[in-house]
Amino acid sequence: MKDFLAYIIKNLVDRPEEVHIKEVQGTHTIIYELTVAKPDIGKIIGKEGRTIKAIRTLLVSVASRNNVKVSLEIMEDK
């Protein structure tokens, strides 16, 4: 699922080499922490958050087939 997420994100941004995804696994939960270049954050979020909502919907659909809950968080680069 991490590769699927990376594929989607890297095709949306201008700097795919700066996309980093950290996977934190719990018992029945997976949290993906997404870090992208500052100029690309707006592209990931999209107008009124529509793009990130669509990405999260896709992840939830894939995860539900495996009986896992999934969460996607956008981390700010400091």
Curated annotation (Swiss-Prot):
Subcellular location: Cytoplasm
Residues of the signal peptide: none
The protein's name: RNA-binding protein KhpA
Gene Ontology MF terms: RNA binding
Purpose of the protein: A probable RNA-binding protein.
InterPro entries reported in the protein's UniProt record: KH_dom-like_a/b, KH_sf_prok-type, KhpA
KH domain location: 29-78
Gene designation: khpA
Source lineage: Bacteria, Pseudomonadati, Chlamydiota, Chlamydiia, Chlamydiales
UniProt keyword terms in alphabetical order: Cytoplasm, RNA-binding
